[in-house]
Amino acid sequence: MSLCLGFRELGLQPYEPVLEAMRRFTEQRSPDSQDEIWLVEHPAVFTQGQAGKAEHLLVPGDIPVVQTDRGGQVTYHGPGQLVAYLLLDVRRLGFGVRELVSRIEQTLIELLASYGVSAAAKPDAPGVYVDGAKIASLGLRIRNGRSFHGLALNVDMDLAPFRRINPCGYAGLAMTQLRDLAGPIELDEVRTRLRGQLVKHLDYAEQTTLTGGID
């Protein structure tokens, strides 16, 4: 089946309204609905996944904490981090959860390789790593064969808030970002490259930019 993947570029948006819009989209979509990926940055926020434990929030301070329904544990979102929410009919695509995670990781690995950065996945810890430091996090939820939530790639951001938590439940996990590995980076360029890699690795025939809000 020839499928077109739609992208919405949302800019900087508060986390909770986007979370509610993702849930609403997933609940209301039909078998014929186009798959969408929402590209967004968030103001500073910690999010707790379904497996999250309070002890991994070390010193949240003035950064809000939001409980969410994605997989995984606590992570941090902030400006300069590229977040992609994958609103896909994975049943229609024919992917299992493990294959979807693997395809997302390979998307990120090839994207980073295009900047000369050698990255890898870990079989026991979803995400993408460079020399043991985490550069991208994954957290998904599948409901009725449809995915939501997605990935977060550290591009050009303040990494200090990660020290207030045990990222993804791992004490002392080092975090890194593309700017520190490849020099000054334009987020818009990374966004464009990410779109192309997602289309390739998720087996879509083409992509389009969607307009309008997510309300």
Swiss-Prot record:
Query: According to its UniProt record, which reaction does this protein catalyse?
Result: octanoyl-[ACP] + L-lysyl-[protein] = N(6)-octanoyl-L-lysyl-[protein] + holo-[ACP] + H(+)
Q: Which Pfam families match?
A: LplA-B_cat (PF21948)
Q: Gene of origin?
A: lipB
| Catalytic activity, EC | 2.3.1.181
Q: Could you tell me the Gene Ontology terms of the biological process aspect for this record? A: protein modification process
Enzyme group, top EC level?
A: transferase
Q: What is noted besides the main data? A: In the reaction, the free carboxyl group of octanoic acid is attached via an amide linkage to the epsilon-amino group of a specific lysine residue of lipoyl domains of lipoate-dependent enzymes.
Q: Which residues form the BPL/LPL catalytic domain?
A: 31-206
**Name of the molecule in the record:** Octanoyltransferase
Tell me the lineage of the source organism: Bacteria, Pseudomonadati, Pseudomonadota, Gammaproteobacteria, Pseudomonadales
